[in-house]
Amino acid sequence: MNKFSNTRIGFTCAVMAPRTLILTVGLLCMRIRSLLCSPAETTVTTAAVTSAHGPLCPLVFQGWAYAVYHQGDMALMTLDVYCCRQTSNNTVVAFSHHPADNTLLIEVGNNTRRHVDGISCQDHFRAQHQDCPAQTVHVRGVNESAFGLTHLQSCCLNEHSQLSERVAYHLKLRPATFGLETWAMYTVGILALGSFSSFYSQIARSLGVLPNDHHYALKKA
């Protein structure tokens, strides 16, 4: 019995080894191509920030986003959103009203006005955070995209501060880490491997879930 089980497992391994090797090589080639073709870290901002990690620019959101580039390529990127404030005359945040053609402009809730009383984050120092929604960040520039950031709030979260200060969002797009994209490729690869008609049946027979036709043929003989 042990000899037959060893033969059955060896047969399964012999059949599956070439397919597994081909699948592994294919996935590695896809991963290498993805790394080579992924764009470098991109700064998407309405403000020129000298220190994006300083106290004036805290990180307010981090997530995944698909970035579409003018070449037509699409890449999975990690999106970091910093909220930058101008708190004094000696500020490190320099706002630009005329970005270059290749600079993406972020339209966020700090320009949002309520239709009821006209309160704006920019000109009303007693505005509350609910007056300044920022549920969607529109990225406009070389390419047009829209990121639905449902958890991103406006810089007006500081209810008791002087909200007449100028605010801007500083966005950074960087290549996705070895995680979500890779697991997605492996999942597709496993499903593709399952397209072989005998893949699942061979595994089931090797585990004893399905009867082995060769085994029953020997018994009948």
Swiss-Prot record:
Keywords associated with the record: Host-virus interaction, Modulation of host NK-cell activity by virus, Viral immunoevasion
Name of this protein: Protein UL40
Highest taxon, organism lineage: Viruses
Main function: Plays a role in the protection against host NK-cell cytotoxicity by up-regulating the cell surface expression of HLA-E independent of TAP (HLA-E has an inhibitory effect on the cytotoxic activity of the NK cell). Also promotes cell surface expression of UL18, another viral protein involved in NK-cell evasion.
GO biological process: one example: symbiont-mediated suppression of host natural killer cell activation
Alphabetical list of InterPro entries matching this protein: Herpes_UL40 (IPR019624)
Region (HLA-E-binding epitope): 15-23
Family listed: Belongs to the HHV-5 UL40 protein family.
Organism classification: Viruses, Duplodnaviria, Heunggongvirae, Peploviricota, Herviviricetes
